[in-house]
Design a protein with these regions (language model features):
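Active/ligand-binding-proximal structured segments within catalytic/core domains
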Residues: 1-18, 199-211, 219-225
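Charge-rich, well-structured scaffold segments of protease-associated domains
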Residues: 10-169, 179-181, 194-195, 212-215, ...
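Catalytic and ligand-binding motifs that coordinate phosphates/metal ions
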Residues: 172
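Active-site glycine/GP-rich loop and adjacent strand/helix microenvironment
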Residues: 175
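A domain-level signal for the structural core that forms small-molecule/cofactor-binding pockets
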Residues: 190
Length: 369
């Protein structure tokens, strides 16, 4: 809605002003932050600062545009509800965090979309778009001092406001499932709690890369290549300010679900016992190459710098991040798996979920006595 007009720009003018500079203007929302951004030529960076400041501070939320956007979001909510993997992730978040805000879908419940009015959006912006919550990041061929001065001019009058004070969620775990008509596969999300971004330790990212990054990883080499249980599978360490999740996702034929879960738990237990030196070297190099590659991409550099500022209050130098990767030992990676298994699994099943599948899954992911 912020792109639907400001006090000084109507909706078409926002698009025209950006496109006249050859720039992209957009936004995205994650569980713990919203980002408004522009991408274009470095010589126009100051223009981008002032345009984003206008959008963030002076959006008018026209009633007619709100009605149209509401219909778009309601349609999107239907599509999310009909998608088995999206459904599995929503169930997984609820299994992890219960009713905490961290467990809620970014799009929100349908009732909120139908209920929210212009006054609600105005109050939300006044509460959240304040100096204590905003970071401004620029990357690329720019003059940092000049951009810093422009940021002060454009955003300097923002009231400081109140910082966010959200209690971290308490991990629960357990099994959630939902049968979706018309699905031929079972979509699963299996995971465990890990530390959030404020714990500046890459051991959990290394653990995820050891377990499931690349075709030579245990997840893919064993479940896909050797046993043929899955076509698609992946593993990530998703870290937010307040919490984190070690996440394994896969799509499997319903009659292979039990075997898939059994083998997954065996692989996790094996990693908890020991991490092979070659697997650690592979994971370390994969993360280092990703870090170096992202450093050559201004958009990724901006996003990572903003997340660093929110979680740590500083931007981590590249050499420091590489040194931290090198400092994690094989025992340190195995310790991540040990802590996760001790916490207990959270599992979500969606799509083709047969009779008794959730009960069998609950027994299969239960830690061994």
């Amino acid at each position: 809605m912020v792109f639907k007009g400001t006090a000084g720009r109507y909706v078409h003018r926002i698009n025209l002003d950006a496109e006249c500079l050859g720039a992209e203007v957009n936004a995205h929302t994650d569980k713990d932050h919203t980002a408004y951004y522009m991408r274009g030529r470095g010589e126009h960076a100051a223009d981008f600062v002032h345009m984003l400041a206008d959008i963030v501070q002076h959006a008018t939320f026209p009633e007619a545009e709100l009605a149209r956007e509401r219909e778009v979001l309601l349609q999107e909510a239907i599509e999310v509800a009909d998608d088995p993997m999206d459904t599995a992730y929503q169930l997984f978040d609820h299994a992890c965090w219960g009713l905490h805000p961290a467990a809620q879908a970014v799009i929100g419940p349908r009732g909120n979309i139908e209920r929210l009015q212009r006054a609600d959006l105005v109050r939300w912006v006044a509460r959240h778009h304040c100096g204590g919550n905003v970071v401004v990041v620029a990357a690329g061929p720019i003059d940092p001092d000049h951009i810093a001065r422009e940021v002060e001019v454009a955003f300097g009058t923002l009231p400081h406001g109140q910082g966010e004070d959200v209690t971290p969620p308490v991990y629960a775990g357990g099994v959630r499932s939902r049968r979706l008509p018309g699905s031929s596969q079972t979509h699963l999300v299996l995971g465990f709690p890990i530390a959030g971004r404020s714990d500046d330790d890459p051991a959990s990212e290394l653990a995820a890369a050891v377990f499931g990054e690349g075709m030579s990883s245990p997840l893919l080499s064993e479940l896909r290549e050797r046993r043929g249980l899955v076509y698609h599978a992946s593993c990530t360490a998703d870290r937010y300010d307040l919490c984190g999740q070690f996440v394994i996702e896969a799509s499997v034929a319903p009659d292979k679900l039990d075997e898939c879960l059994r083998e997954l738990m065996k692989l996790l237990a094996r990693q908890a016992r020991a991490t092979e030196a070659m697997d650690l070297q592979r994971a370390r190099n994969q993360l280092a190459v990703r870090l170096l590659r992202d450093r050559d991409r201004p958009a990724q550099r901006m996003e990572q710098a903003a997340l660093d500022l929110f979680a740590l209050g500083r931007v981590r130098p590249r050499d420091e991040q590489l040194a931290r990767l090198d400092a994690v030992s094989a025992a340190g990676v195995s310790a991540v798996f040990q802590r996760m298994l001790a916490a207990g699994a959270a599992l979500a099943l969606a799509g083709h979920v047969g009779s008794g599948a959730a009960e069998r899954a609950r027994a299969l992911v239960r830690p061994a006595a």
